[in-house]
Amino acid sequence: MRAVLLHGTKDVRVDDVPMPRIVEDGDAIIQLAAACVCGSDLWPYRGIDPISSPVSAGHEYCGVVQEVGASVTNVKPGDFVVGSFFASDNTCDICRSGYQSSCLDRRPMGAENCQAEHVRVPLADGTLVATPSTPDPDLIPSLLACSDVLGTG
């Protein structure tokens, strides 16, 4: 599949990378409908955060669930979902207090590459929120703001 990778300062490429797969029972694979560029994605692009090997870009996303791990119960294949920039379990005391980005088991989604055709989402039950139906294509870009807000509480 294709994915955006940062190879160095002002060096952005669309590369072929392996398709993500279910690694843990709580994972989901999402076919991305939209993703955005965050200011923190621009730090390595501008050379402020130097990189020595290609790194993934993007961590705010929405799309359609393609596959779920054995323990996932909150979303199913075919659901349109919005995901947080941090994967979180949404069960620990910190999450239950509304601070999912500080979850005891949090995982940054930037490492998963949300600027791609598909993405693996760990802790899917705590990270993904399904919409009641597939949104109108004109609404999808607006849902990206939710991706940032979901993790900040």
What are these regions (language model features)?
Residues G8-K10, A35-V37:
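Short polar catalytic/cofactor-binding loops
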Residues A3, V17, D41, G63-V65, ...:
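Buried hydrophobic positions in well-ordered alpha/beta secondary-structure cores of metabolic enzymes
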Residues P20-C36, I48-D93, E112, P132-P135:
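Glycine-rich beta-strand-centered segment in the early N-terminal region that forms part
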Residues S40-R46:
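Cytochrome P450 core scaffold surrounding the K-helix E-X-X-R motif
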Residues D11-P18:
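Short glycine/threonine/proline-enriched tight-turn/helix- or strand-capping micro-motif at secondary-structure
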Residues P18, V37-G39, S102-L104:
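Sequence contexts marking disulfide-bonded cysteines in secreted/extracellular proteins
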Residues D89-G153:
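NAD(P)H dinucleotide-binding glycine-rich loop of Rossmann-like/cofactor-binding domains
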Residues L5-H7, R46, V65, R96:
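Residue-level signal for short segments within beta-strands and strand-turn junctions
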